[in-house]
Design a protein with these regions (language model features):
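A short, flexible loop at the N-terminus of ABC-type nucleotide-binding domains that lies
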Residues: 1-31, 72-74, 91-92
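The feature captures the beta-strand-to-loop junction immediately N-terminal to the Walker
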Residues: 39-41
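Helix-to-loop junction immediately C-terminal to a conserved catalytic motif
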Residues: 54
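Conserved ABC transporter NBD signature motif
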Residues: 61-69
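Conserved ABC ATPase "signature" region
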Residues: 115-132
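Conserved ABC ATPase signature
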Residues: 136-140, 144
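Catalytic Walker B motif of ABC-type/P-loop ATPase nucleotide-binding domains
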Residues: 161-165
Length: 267
């Protein structure tokens, strides 16, 4: 019997033009069936972390999926194993939602099989955007493009799924829909890492949460243990109260800045 899917991240470093963006990021092993939320203030390196794992920026260190070195994968190997959703799709593309999803599935939108179309349409319908399948991406709203980007990220069935702020432009109903899809993917045996700004949403859906701050991992663990008044003051520089709902999940109430000078210095 094969061992469960595992992602290892050790001493991950990324620099842009000589400026360090991630400084020796290490995490406990991540396992199949887990949805990991990645949170932190603006500029903490969350998007860069996902891009490094996806092989979209140069990085050093150790990133291994089932013992295989992700940082050395070819483009085709990466496409096979990693589904990546960026913060936004290009706004000027004339591909339809269906064509873009087929391109993500097969590498191009031409010469696809009927079974490919069925698979792509099933994913599109599951995300609630079936009526948009034949519309060009440039005609869509920001929220609709996010859902189209999610379809492209998950259509291959990759074992590792990376979602960069997938709910930032969505209303409450579509936020639930996206997070429910992310949870479903994890429950099917994938590893799903989601960048979120909403800690309450992270606590509702994630098995564990990683907090990035000042280019490093500040804390990691289950949301109920990690999210605290002290964490919010140290990382986000706010006075806040963490309370727990009847299901034992934390939610956050922000009362104001902990220090106006500190808040301004982080922007």
């Amino acid at each position: 019997m094969s061992s469960p899917l595992t992602l290892q991240v050790r001493d991950l470093k990324v620099s842009y033009n000589g400026r360090e963006v991630l400084n020796r990021i290490s995490l406990p092993d991540l396992h199949a069936g887990e949805l990991i939320a990645l949170a932190g203030p603006n500029g903490a390196g969350k998007s860069t972390f996902l891009k490094a794992i996806a092989g979209l920026v140069h990085a050093t260190g150790c990133v291994r999926l089932d013992g295989r070195d992700c940082l050395r994968w070819s483009a085709s190997e990466r496409a096979q194993h990693v589904g990546f959703m960026p913060q936004a799709l290009p706004e000027d593309t004339r591909l339809t939602v269906l064509e873009a999803t087929l391109a993500a599935l097969r590498g191009n939108a031409a010469g696809v099989r009927r079974q490919d179309e069925i698979q792509a349409l099933q994913v599109i319908d599951r995300l609630g955007i079936g009526e948009l399948a034949l519309r060009p991406l440039f005609e869509l709203s920001g929220g609709q493009r996010q859902l189209a980007a999610l379809a492209q990220a998950v259509v291959r069935g990759s074992p590792l799924v990376l979602l960069d702020e997938p709910v930032s432009a969505l209303d409450l109903a579509h936020q639930w829909q996206v997070m429910n899809e992310a949870r479903r993917l994890a429950d099917e045996g994938r590893i799903v890492i989601v960048v979120l700004h909403d800690l309450t949403l992270a606590a509702q859906w994630a098995n564990r949460i990683a907090i990035l701050n000042e280019r490093q991992v500040h804390s990691f663990g289950c949301p109920a243990e990690v999210i605290s008044d002290q964490l919010l003051q140290e990382v986000w520089c706010v006075r806040a109260r963490v309370r727990f709902c009847e299901q034992g999940r934390p939610y956050v109430l922000v009362d104001g800045p902990a220090s106006q000078s500190r808040v301004c210095s982080t922007l």
